[in-house]
């Protein structure tokens, strides 16, 4: 516990209609080699009796603070900012409710990245679960390889948009730098993590991909969901064009598709190749429409987006 005495970590987790993965996550938090000083559950309130019972259950857990969030008040950046503002530790760990630590060393391995003062953020490797299929497994390996990596402004030419990649599925931040950057942007449909990473890198800090810090996390999206998710991605790139306009993300997307295609061909998975082409088409269309959202009528934007409530006040 000597290391824990030297540097403390607070954990912030937005919660909405949690399932078994969340309970596994909380159990794993209690088993970490370095335990978090505090866990702040930013709980978007449901209207069911079951949800109320779960809230009461976690209110009783030592070290856990449950912060009620009204559904209409939830914001990807703002809600996380609210949690970070409550934190007193020098490091804060942001997680989603469906990210389950693989072992007891997640927090320890992330903390280790901050031995160097210039490191402002570190994010974990995401492992695909069995049920998501071969395409998602390969995508996870592509985006989260076995080799750790330090990323600085000098890597923009080589890595392109991947320089700014960071995921709040499981990412630790140096709170002093986070505050210096003004926290997460509050007006964004999502992608607050990459926007923060971009600001940190542009300010001269380092973002680390820590391959030895691992969480189980993956999704199995259908064509419609792929379209909507990538529509929202395109929206965020359009809204923050000062960050993303000079760096193409489409080149990286093409590289992923081609490498996945080769992998599936070698595995003789013709069925998966057909699925890959289908999904990639929806991704591409969604992203292209999202980048041009400001030219679309609001009713069409609502249909295309996965974040319906984001558009309640118009195009913004």
Report the location of each language-model feature.
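Short, well-formed alpha-helical segments that are part of the catalytic scaffolds
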Residues: 18-31
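Short beta-strand/loop segment that forms part of the nucleotide-sugar
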Residues: 26, 37-47, 67-69
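Glycine-rich, basic loop-to-helix element that forms the pyrophosphate-binding segment
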Residues: 70-87
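Short aromatic/hydrophobic "clamp" motif used to bind/position activated sugar donors
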Residues: 92
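Conserved donor NDP-sugar-binding/catalytic core segment of glycosyltransferases
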Residues: 100, 104-137
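A recurrent flexible, glycine/aromatic-enriched loop bordering the glycosyltransferase active site
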Residues: 153-173, 189
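Acidic donor-binding loop at a coil-to-helix junction in glycosyltransferase catalytic cores
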Residues: 190-196
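Non-catalytic, C-terminal membrane-associated alpha-helical segments of glycosyltransferases
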Residues: 232, 246-316
């Amino acid at each position: 516990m000597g290391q824990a005495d030297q540097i403390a970590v607070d954990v912030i987790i937005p919660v909405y209609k949690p399932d078994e993965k969340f309970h596994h996550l909380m159990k794993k938090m209690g088993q970490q080699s370095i335990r978090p000083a505090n866990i702040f559950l930013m709980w978007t309130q449901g209207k069911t009796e079951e949800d109320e019972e779960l809230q009461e259950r976690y209110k009783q857990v030592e070290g856990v603070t449950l912060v009620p969030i009204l559904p209409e008040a939830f914001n990807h950046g703002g809600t996380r900012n609210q949690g970070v503002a409550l934190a007193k530790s020098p490091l804060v760990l942001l997680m989603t409710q469906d990210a389950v630590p693989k072992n007891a060393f997640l927090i320890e391995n992330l903390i280790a990245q901050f031995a160097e003062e210039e490191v402002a953020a570190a994010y974990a490797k995401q492992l695909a679960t069995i049920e998501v299929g071969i395409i998602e497994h390969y995508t996870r390996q592509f985006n989260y390889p076995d080799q750790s990596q330090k990323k600085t402004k000098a890597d923009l030419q080589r890595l392109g948009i991947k320089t700014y990649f960071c995921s709040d599925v499981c990412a630790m931040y140096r709170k002093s730098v986070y505050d210096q950057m003004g926290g997460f942007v509050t007006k964004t449909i999502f992608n607050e993590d990459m926007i923060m990473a971009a600001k940190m890198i542009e300010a001269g800090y380092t973002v680390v991909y820590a391959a030895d810090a691992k969480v189980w996390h993956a999704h199995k999206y259908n064509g419609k969901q792929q379209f909507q998710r990538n529509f929202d991605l395109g929206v965020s790139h359009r809204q923050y064009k000062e960050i993303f306009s000079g760096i193409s993300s489409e080149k990286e997307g093409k590289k992923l598709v081609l490498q996945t295609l080769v992998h599936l061909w070698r595995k003789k998975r013709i069925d998966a190749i057909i699925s890959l082409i289908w999904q990639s088409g929806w991704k591409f269309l969604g992203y292209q429409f999202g980048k041009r959202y400001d030219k679309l009528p609001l009713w069409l934007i609502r249909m295309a987006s996965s974040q319906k409530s984001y558009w309640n006040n118009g195009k913004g």
